[in-house]
Design a protein with these regions (language model features):
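Generic hydrophobic, aliphatic-rich segments that mediate packing or membrane embedding
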Residues: 61-62, 80-84
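Alpha-helical interface subdomain recognition
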Residues: 1-72, 181-334
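FAD-binding core of flavoproteins
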Residues: 73-79, 86-197, 323-334
Length: 334
């Protein structure tokens, strides 16, 4: 089933999510047309139970879909909406909105307002599923105050106390950083493979001193390092999504996000090294991917944060060796 979903989405993105479309949405902040195409195809309901109108898939079955969001630099929150609609369905919400939903960790202010910094795709999302230390809300972005964040489609979003009260408050609570870590790891894995493939193709096409630069040993070494990181990240993302439910395991997500974030830094640097100056230009597609590698590396915590999560798990909650923690995390049949 996961291959069928991935293949169908790949065909849709080949037609509807070209680099030109990504550039247009980044410039305008309007992803409504692309979102309409994706939503009408049913992909956003992949994690919703069949009894509630969805496909009833589990997290490991939609890894391919989330990875494609990275491979095609999808500029609308498809993976986030899949997760959000599943959580809303679990909470018994009837009539889940059809618009796009992103996820964010927020902070309730003393005046009752709610602030979220660096909301992924906050410029284009129709709503945000926000969690603080105790509560969770579904809030529209229509009347919220949005200011640009570091990545072009992200935003800092602020809701007044009245807007928070008017929003939908859920009785359940989820750690959004955990969910975003899982999503970002999968997206990174797709983007990393795309960058590697594009760089490999460029090295075979670019001729210098009478032969493709990919024939030079120094370039071959850099490509081999990129391949190592890209495929290790893919395996790590598989581990992070190794769940039969929609909520991932915290330790496995920590491993996945840490490894994919490490790979993002190395692969982005090596790809630009091989491409040279052309890779940095606006007209060349590489920057669409490498900007996201850097953004997703930081989103939800970079590798240092997730290394800390693993260290805390070992010191505070486990007995035995570090190897025992690694074995338990990587034993996906457990």
């Amino acid at each position: 089933m996961d291959d069928l979903f991935s293949d169908a989405l790949r065909q849709l993105l080949d037609d509807q999510c070209t680099p030109a479309v990504v550039r247009q949405i980044e410039a305008s902040g309007d992803g409504a047309a692309l979102w309409s195409q994706i939503d009408s195809s049913g992909f956003a309901d992949a994690l919703v139970p069949e009894a509630q109108g969805g496909a009833g898939l589990s997290l490991h079955e939609v890894l391919g879909v989330m990875a494609l969001c990275g491979r095609y630099t999808v500029p609308v929150p498809l993976a986030e909406t899949m997760m959000a609609r599943s959580l809303l369905a679990q909470a018994g919400v009837v009539g889940v909105p059809h618009g796009s939903i992103t996820l964010a960790q927020g902070q309730r202010m003393t005046d009752g307002s709610l602030m979220c910094t660096g909301v992924q795709l906050g410029r284009v999302a129709d709503a945000v599923l926000v969690s603080d230390a105790q509560h969770m809300w579904l809030l529209s972005t229509q009347d919220a105050q949005r200011t640009p964040a570091s990545f072009v489609l992200d935003a800092d979003v602020h809701w007044s106390a009245q807007q928070v009260t008017a929003g939908l408050q859920l009785t359940q609570h989820q750690d959004m950083r955990l969910l975003l870590g899982c999503i970002n790891a999968a997206q990174l894995s797709g983007a990393l493979l795309a960058v590697f493939n594009k760089t490999l193709q460029y090295a075979n096409d670019r001729v210098q001193f009478g032969k493709p630069i990919g024939k030079f040993q120094a370039i071959q070494h850099q490509l081999s390092v990129m391949a190592e990181h890209s495929f290790a990240a893919h395996m790590a993302a598989q581990l992070g999504c190794a769940s039969d439910t929609v909520v991932p395991d915290r330790v496995r997500v920590a491993v996945a996000k840490a490894r994919t974030s490490e790979a993002a830094l190395e692969v982005a640097a090596l790809s630009h090294s091989i491409h040279g100056a052309i890779g940095f230009t606006h007209e060349f597609d590489l920057q669409l991917f490498t900007r996201r590698l850097h953004a997703w590396r930081q989103a939800g915590g970079a590798e240092s944060y997730w290394h800390g999560v693993l260290g805390s798990e070992l010191v505070d909650h486990r007995q035995g060796l570090a190897l025992d923690l690694i074995r338990s995390a990587t034993d996906v049949t457990a």
